[in-house]
């Protein structure tokens, strides 16, 4: 399971060092690499096993909005293998979508991890701070026992 967050840099070639704790989970998920796609101005990285499960779920989605989502999410997906230094290469097209230039944040989300630009991550955290002021959000969190 992918947990916690860590701050990194992306090199000029688009390579990201994957933390050792994430690499262990990646290998346990079927291979030494991840499938990466785009969503919410970030990149979502899944183990190959998890990605296969997602594809099965998405396959049955037939509505017009879901067909568009499939094109967007699956059409922008890239296989990113870990090199010997534990890095993955992020292709320029999806790097641009997420605004990844120098400072980045890797965020563990249990079944996947997300890759954010530091700037976008700070914005996302500020939005969450605002959301936490809403009673319905606090109640939803409390319903989880937190």
Curated annotation (Swiss-Prot):
BP GO annotations: negative regulation of DNA-templated transcription initiation
GO MF annotation list: DNA-binding transcription factor activity; transcription cis-regulatory region binding
Q: Which SUPFAM superfamilies match?
A: AbrB/MazE/MraZ-like
* Matching Pfam families: MraZ
Question: What is its subcellular localisation?
Answer: Cytoplasm, Nucleoid
Q: Which InterPro entries match?
A: MraZ (IPR003444), MraZ_C (IPR035644), MraZ_dom (IPR020603), MraZ_N (IPR035642), MraZ_sf (IPR038619), SpoVT-AbrB_dom (IPR007159), SpoVT-AbrB_sf (IPR037914)
Q: Listed GO cellular component terms? A: cytoplasm; nucleoid
Annotated SpoVT-AbrB domain ranges read 5-50, 77-120
Q: Give the matching PROSITE patterns.
A: SPOVT_ABRB
Note whether Transcription occurs among the keywords.
Answer: yes
Q: Is Iron tagged as a keyword?
A: no
Main location class: cytoplasm
The protein's UniProt keywords, in alphabetical order, are: Cytoplasm, DNA-binding, Repeat, Transcription, Transcription regulation
The organism's place on the tree of life at top rank: Bacteria
As for family, the record states: Belongs to the MraZ family.
User: Which NCBIfam families has this protein been placed in?
Assistant: division/cell wall cluster transcriptional repressor MraZ
Indicate the quaternary assembly: Forms oligomers.
What is the official name of this protein in its record? Transcriptional regulator MraZ
> In which organism is this protein found?
Desulforapulum autotrophicum (strain ATCC 43914 / DSM 3382 / VKM B-1955 / HRM2)
List the lineage, top down: Bacteria, Pseudomonadati, Thermodesulfobacteriota, Desulfobacteria, Desulfobacterales
Q: Its gene? A: mraZ
């Amino acid at each position: 399971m992918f947990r916690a967050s860590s701050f990194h840099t992306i090199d000029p070639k688009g390579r990201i060092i994957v933390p050792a704790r994430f690499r262990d989970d990646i290998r346990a998920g079927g291979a030494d690499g991840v499938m990466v796609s785009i969503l919410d101005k970030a990149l979502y990285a899944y183990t190959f096993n998890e990605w296969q499960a997602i594809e099965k779920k998405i396959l049955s989605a037939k509505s017009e909005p879901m067909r568009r989502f499939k094109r967007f999410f699956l059409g922008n997906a890239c296989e990113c293998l870990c090199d010997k230094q534990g890095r993955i290469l992020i292709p320029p097209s999806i790097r641009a979508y997420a605004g990844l230039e120098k400072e980045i944040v890797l965020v563990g989300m249990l079944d996947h991890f997300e890759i954010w630009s530091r700037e976008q991550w700070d914005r996302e955290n500020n939005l969450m701070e605002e959301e936490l002021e809403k009673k319905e959000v606090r109640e939803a969190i409390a319903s989880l026992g937190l």
